[in-house]
């Protein structure tokens, strides 16, 4: 039987950030860890012939400095929620969870996690943009900041930064079930906490290491009760056996705990992914049902065949609209 190291048993640290305060803070929180100095994070992260599926069982941590910028315009497959100046930020690369369908598996060459400790430079880059226009920024697309908050403290820092900049609204998206954070952080109406919620069957089969759906629902309620605007993301919807029953039960579970009228909004969308990402994922995960489904290729993006996609999305809109006004339900198009 294969024996894996524990998560973050090995930490690679760029020589240029060994004395950075955040590097020291992170290393102080890790026990029984082997620390290895490197010249550049890409020496480890971008090595050829890495197996992301194998690394998911024993992720290494890489502490690095971002020197090329972290703020990007939003991608076509992502929802802007009607916001004009839509950007996302990569202050981390990769996620401690292991969702089989996640596009990160196709985008990155490694399953290891990179944390850019020079958050102050990312804030400076963002301030230059904010001097020109208002910004809607997703800060947790390429990682789950909430899930690793005890180690990095980035969520706290993003909230504090946003409170100081009135023309900035951020979204922090997560599959973490942590409830303890929100009561300890001062709420801001421009910090949207977004929870991705899936049916129990989908979570059990494909969302490895992520918090259980009911734990995410409880955490979303905690965030709402603490004064944060909360977004629920039923996205991506995953086609599975008895999908109608699975998603119907999930909606019932959600709105038995959460008052839909108090939600900031809701996101609905079926699974879609870049053709290049899926090609790479299929090579790495030949036995994954969700990765190897016979999707349709529409203009370079794989998605469910039209009959499946429209049935799932229309079903979900109808189910959610019993609890949430339709003008607060957003669809990916």
Show the residue positions of the predicted features:
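Conserved Radical SAM active-site core
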Residues: 62-85, 100-194
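Structured alpha-helical segments in the cores of large, soluble enzyme domains
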Residues: 125-131, 181-183, 213-226, 316
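Short, electropositive alpha-helical surface patch
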Residues: 152, 193-196, 243-259, 285-292
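Conserved C-terminal portion of the radical SAM core fold
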Residues: 216-276, 324, 330-331
